[in-house]
A protein has these predicted regions:
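Beta-propeller domain segments
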Residues: 89, 106-110, 116-119, 123-130, ...
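Asp-box/WD-like beta-propeller blade repeats and closely related beta-sheet repeat scaffolds
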Residues: 23-24, 33, 38-40, 50-95, ...
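Residue position within the beta-strands of beta-propeller blades
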Residues: 1-3, 46-47, 101-104, 150-155
Length: 193
């Protein structure tokens, strides 16, 4: 499954299991900044700038509908995310318990926002959303360590302080809600002017 800049989610279907896609099928369209994709218990989750959706039993649906132009039913997971497109791409990942993790980038290069969702990595479950990491300018990827299960994530450094300053980061979350410095400090010890 692939999120395209054209606002579509595409299923690449390998019917003969040779590692190459035999068919390409649009399964969602007219999305804004379609990006993050995660599969859990057979359901496909995907994001756009202010929403997260799921399609239930995606593999079964594809097997029954690969040759027609129908679109599967999308189920809204949340539409309570900021709509700013600056750092608006959302990346998704489920943990082993099925809780969905996603990023919300800062809506600017350097700023403070009253909306606590910005500049963070969040987790959503039946009880709502919760902070996993704060002070994260813009993560473009994260995953869980296979043994420790700790979350590791990237964070893109701020702009306009120099060619290579501050560095982008690879961080580890040790406690929920941990603060990683943005907008005050970058790359461990670079203070914001």
């Amino acid at each position: 499954f692939v999120g395209e800049r054209t606002g579509q989610i595409i299923a690449l279907y390998d019917s003969d299991k040779n590692g190459e896609a035999d068919y390409k099928k649009v399964i969602a369209k007219d999305l804004q900044l379609s990006s993050g994709i995660s599969i859990f218990n057979g359901d496909l989750y995907f994001s756009e700038v202010s929403k997260i959706w799921k399609i239930q039993n995606i593999e079964s649906w594809l097997n029954d509908n690969i040759s027609n132009s129908d679109l599967p039913k999308k189920v809204l997971v949340t539409d309570e995310l900021p709509s700013d497109t600056w750092h608006g791409w959302k990346w998704l990942k489920h943990d082993e318990q099925g809780e969905l993790y996603f990023n919300v980038g800062a809506p600017c290069n350097i700023c403070l926002s009253e909306n606590s969702q910005y500049a963070s990595i969040l987790r959503i479950n039946d009880a709502g959303w919760h902070h996993v990491a704060k002070g994260v300018r813009n993560s473009v990827g994260f995953d869980f360590h296979p043994v420790t299960k700790k979350l590791f994530f990237t964070d893109n450094g701020r702009d306009w302080m120099g060619d290579d300053t501050p560095s982008c980061e690879l961080n580890r979350v040790d406690i929920n809600g941990q603060f990683f410095g943005y907008p005050y400090k970058h790359a461990t010890n670079v203070k914001d002017p």
